[in-house]
Amino acid sequence: MISINNLLVQRNGRDALKVASLEIQKGETLAVVGPNGAGKSTLLLALAHLIKPVDGGITFHGKPLKDWDDIEYRRKIAFVFQDPLLMDMSVRDNIALGLKFRGVKKEDALERVIKWSKAMGVESLLKRRAGQLSGGEAQRVSLARAFVLDPELLLMDEPFSAVDPQTRAQLLKDLSKVLAEDHRTTIFVTHNLKEAGKFGDRVAVIINSELKQVDMPEHIKTNPADESVKAFLEEL
């Protein structure tokens, strides 16, 4: 579904991300780990085509991103951030906002909102305003808002790092259940290797702006690709 080859992304004149080769299969959940500032978020921005490489490229369904119409491509993806970024309106209107911009009929939009508000456990909150939500509730709304768009590719940038550990664990459990049933291609950035191992089909390790290793979680722990990966694992 996604192929990355000889990718080089620069920001402010410096190398921000280097990826020699990476294949992401349809329906796969890839967890991305690495130190702060390593280039994890840059990978998501490149996949969203919000920043463009200076060399190499990314293909989506065999077609280079540079050849996709930006509007057409962005209809196929959804982004979930650490900050839910909810608007000052009801939960229902927040979830449906993207559908409104896409011209989805009200009946279809309502059906989708109900489906995903149930899946994310916020159906009882639909009439509540965003400012009245807890951190965990707000992030559940953010997830529902992403899924309601029916994206082919879901990009998640440390979406649960701002909530308490108990809420985080429950959110991950619920999201894992949804993805197990939904089989949606997902790239999930996290600092937590244990979390990555539970959530991801594979784990990608980015260190010093370079993709160092992509493997099954247990293989990375026992067979780090080089000393930088080994040192990163030892610091966790």
Annotate each language-model stretch with its function.
Residues 33-35:
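The feature captures the beta-strand-to-loop junction immediately N-terminal to the Walker
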Residues 48:
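Helix-to-loop junction immediately C-terminal to a conserved catalytic motif
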Residues 107-125, 176-177:
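Conserved ABC ATPase "signature" region
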Residues 129-133, 137:
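Conserved ABC ATPase signature
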Residues 154-158:
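Catalytic Walker B motif of ABC-type/P-loop ATPase nucleotide-binding domains
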